[in-house]
Amino acid sequence: MLVIEDVRAYEVLDSRGNPTVKAEVTLSDGSVGAAIVPSGASTGSKEALELRDNDERFGGKGVLKAVANVNETIADEILGLDAFNQTQLDDTLRELDGTNNYSNLGANATLGVSMATARAAAAALGMPLYRYLGGANASILPVPMCNIINGGAHANNNVDFQEFMIMPFGFTSFKEALRSVCEIYAILKKELANSGHSTALGDEGGFAPNLANNTEPIDLLMTCIKKAGYENRVKIALDVASTEFFKDGKYHMEGKAFSSEALIERYVELCAKYPICSIEDGLAENDFEGWIKLTEKLGNKIQLVGDDLFVTNEDILREGIIKKMANAVLIKPNQIGTITQTMRTVRLAQRNNYKCVMSHRSGESEDAFIADFAVALNTGQIKTGALARGERTAKYNRLLEIEFESDEYLGEKL
């Protein structure tokens, strides 16, 4: 048995220049695992707590408290634990914190240790991370949801919807699917430049132009897909992030106030006009009646993803399944705080025929853990931004590496 011999953490920077936690775990055989924790901008109110210092450093965004919690409180408790018993480790972290949202230790502290331990254990066995976490059944390369036009909280522009994505279904390999996205992305840049729009990038590497409304980005994507020659092989996905513009019971966008019913009808119209295959957070996280109506209306036609609605929380997802809200769940490990809790949520979803989408955060790093994690859990889909910015391409490049060992791409089977 190999045990955890040393744990340490320190501040590093995420892709927005904000501090985040990097954790390193050393095992008794000398194997080392490290992990960098991401951070979100558009966050659900029920997410696990990201502990910040709230002092003068970095405008209050320092994470020295979380770092100290790893180096002192957590290290004292987990030294000597079996490195291969991830469940025991993660349950220990949860019990040590003593809350249901990691408000004492910080989910950025616990997740860093959880991820780093998994990496160290995989290294000790000489196994790739996806194989260690997923076993022999980890074999499916996910279909990417590539966010190539950014709006909402991820960009400084006038577009309400947060992400306009393309999904390459009609391909037999991940590398060919990714190639199609690269070509569409390049054409989009030219289209924007030629029409006098900004080609500045948002947080997730997508372009962030000012556009007339929330339909114009979709028209742009359709034009680029056609010019690239990928009609009927690439579809559209949206992350509306509607909680961000929900106030006083109405959805405020494009200078108007929409009721839940009116916004649902807007989605119905969009789905009739465009090849939209997925809508994420189409309604606000607490608009439960609206979610039920949305699912009744579109749930048998397209994928309806709950992000803020479910926050990767097994108990909240279970309640949503019972109430028939959405038919898919976004998976963000830092919303829940440990690898084990993330895996439990994925398994609950899969048992109930809810699809899963592994996801990055808008504040990311070069850490490509979620690429392995998506393959390990056979989520079938991954969101990790545009084909730009190193923290985004790190995940795509890791998936290309994995494809050499495991070449089943879900594509048309999804």
Curated annotation (Swiss-Prot):
<feature type="active site" description="Proton donor">
    <location>
        <position position="204"/>
    </location>
</feature>
<keyword id="KW-0460">Magnesium</keyword>
<dbReference type="InterPro" id="IPR036849">
    <property type="entry name" value="Enolase-like_C_sf"/>
</dbReference>
<dbReference type="Pfam" id="PF00113">
    <property type="entry name" value="Enolase_C"/>
</dbReference>
<dbReference type="Pfam" id="PF03952">
    <property type="entry name" value="Enolase_N"/>
</dbReference>
<comment type="similarity">
    <text>Belongs to the enolase family.</text>
</comment>
<feature type="binding site">
    <location>
        <position position="383"/>
    </location>
    <ligand>
        <name>(2R)-2-phosphoglycerate</name>
    </ligand>
</feature>
<comment type="function">
    <text>Catalyzes the reversible conversion of 2-phosphoglycerate (2-PG) into phosphoenolpyruvate (PEP). It is essential for the degradation of carbohydrates via glycolysis.</text>
</comment>
<dbReference type="GO" id="GO:0006096">
    <property type="term" value="P:glycolytic process"/>
</dbReference>
<dbReference type="GO" id="GO:0005576">
    <property type="term" value="C:extracellular region"/>
</dbReference>
<dbReference type="InterPro" id="IPR020810">
    <property type="entry name" value="Enolase_C"/>
</dbReference>
<feature type="active site" description="Proton acceptor">
    <location>
        <position position="332"/>
    </location>
</feature>
<keyword id="KW-0964">Secreted</keyword>
<feature type="binding site">
    <location>
        <position position="307"/>
    </location>
    <ligand>
        <name>Mg(2+)</name>
    </ligand>
</feature>
<keyword id="KW-0963">Cytoplasm</keyword>
<protein>
    <recommendedName>
        <fullName>Enolase</fullName>
        <ecNumber>4.2.1.11</ecNumber>
    </recommendedName>
</protein>
<keyword id="KW-0479">Metal-binding</keyword>
<feature type="binding site">
    <location>
        <position position="280"/>
    </location>
    <ligand>
        <name>Mg(2+)</name>
    </ligand>
</feature>
<keyword id="KW-0456">Lyase</keyword>
<dbReference type="GO" id="GO:0000287">
    <property type="term" value="F:magnesium ion binding"/>
</dbReference>
<dbReference type="InterPro" id="IPR029017">
    <property type="entry name" value="Enolase-like_N"/>
</dbReference>
<keyword id="KW-0324">Glycolysis</keyword>
<comment type="pathway">
    <text>Carbohydrate degradation; glycolysis; pyruvate from D-glyceraldehyde 3-phosphate: step 4/5.</text>
</comment>
<dbReference type="InterPro" id="IPR020809">
    <property type="entry name" value="Enolase_CS"/>
</dbReference>
<dbReference type="GO" id="GO:0009986">
    <property type="term" value="C:cell surface"/>
</dbReference>
<dbReference type="InterPro" id="IPR020811">
    <property type="entry name" value="Enolase_N"/>
</dbReference>
<feature type="binding site">
    <location>
        <position position="239"/>
    </location>
    <ligand>
        <name>Mg(2+)</name>
    </ligand>
</feature>
<dbReference type="GO" id="GO:0004634">
    <property type="term" value="F:phosphopyruvate hydratase activity"/>
</dbReference>
<feature type="binding site">
    <location>
        <position position="362"/>
    </location>
    <ligand>
        <name>(2R)-2-phosphoglycerate</name>
    </ligand>
</feature>
<dbReference type="GO" id="GO:0000015">
    <property type="term" value="C:phosphopyruvate hydratase complex"/>
</dbReference>
<feature type="binding site">
    <location>
        <position position="332"/>
    </location>
    <ligand>
        <name>(2R)-2-phosphoglycerate</name>
    </ligand>
</feature>
<feature type="binding site">
    <location>
        <position position="162"/>
    </location>
    <ligand>
        <name>(2R)-2-phosphoglycerate</name>
    </ligand>
</feature>
<feature type="binding site">
    <location>
        <position position="361"/>
    </location>
    <ligand>
        <name>(2R)-2-phosphoglycerate</name>
    </ligand>
</feature>
<dbReference type="InterPro" id="IPR000941">
    <property type="entry name" value="Enolase"/>
</dbReference>
